[in-house]
């Protein structure tokens, strides 16, 4: 993750799968988590544990086909986490992404959503979760009063949301929510 993904960070993951090419060379990882948003399942009328987030596709380029690697990871996820009915992922417009890999693997596009890059705190852009972990809160008013009077939320480009159903029972709902794919 540190070397093969633009974020240069390893996210918290519940399940991860190594990717190898046909020569047996390790090519990277595909990681899934419960998601940063504790309400990730509610917009789909599901409960926590039925929805996971694809948090990282970090590959070194030696794999034969990224879409095939992702498809295999989704099949393994379905086996290893049978309670999971849906996978959510986001394409990051801040990186110029529109979700080409999700389009290539037939995910459903749900739209674009406001994105926060982080909070400028003491002159440094910091992720809200890191601030919350350190101070027990990340509310701007509290941070301005106790840490940095100049603290401010930094907005980013929108994130593009895609979902991949693992359970046929949720297909009708997902299809009704889906929109045409965005283009460059």
Question: Which ranges hold each PLM region?
Answer:
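Short hydrophobic/aromatic beta-strand or adjacent loop that forms the aromatic wall/cage
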Residues: 14, 157-162
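Conserved beta-hairpin
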Residues: 13-34
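Acyl-donor binding region in acyl/amide transferases
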Residues: 33-152
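Hydrophobic helices that insert into or interface with lipid environments
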Residues: 136-137, 167-176
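Structured loops at beta-to-helix junctions and adjacent beta-edge loops in soluble globular domains
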Residues: 22, 33, 57, 165-167
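C-terminal accessory module of base-excision DNA glycosylases/AP lyases that mediates lesion recognition
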Residues: 152, 157-159, 170
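Short amphipathic alpha-helix that is part of the acyltransferase structural core
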Residues: 1-12
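Short, cationic low-complexity segments
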Residues: 175-184
């Amino acid at each position: 993750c540190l070397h093969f993904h633009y974020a240069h960070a390893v996210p918290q993951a519940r399940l991860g799968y190594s990717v190898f090419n046909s020569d047996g060379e390790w090519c990277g990882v595909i990681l899934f988590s419960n998601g940063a948003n504790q309400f990730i399942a509610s917009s789909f009328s599901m409960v926590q544990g039925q929805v996971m987030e694809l948090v990282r596709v970090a590959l070194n380029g030696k794999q034969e086909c990224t879409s095939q690697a992702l498809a295999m990871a989704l099949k393994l996820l379905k086996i290893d986490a049978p309670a999971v009915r849906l996978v959510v992922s986001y394409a990051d417009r801040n990186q110029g992404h529109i979700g080409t890999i999700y389009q290539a693997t037939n995910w459903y596009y749900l739209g674009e959503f406001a994105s926060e890059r982080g909070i400028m705190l003491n002159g440094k852009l910091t992720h809200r979760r890191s601030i919350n972990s350190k101070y027990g809160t990340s509310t701007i008013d509290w941070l301005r009063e106790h840490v940095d009077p100049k603290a401010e939320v930094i907005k980013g480009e929108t994130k593009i949301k895609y979902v991949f159903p693992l359970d046929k029972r949720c297909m009708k709902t997902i299809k009704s929510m889906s929109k045409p794919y965005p283009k460059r």
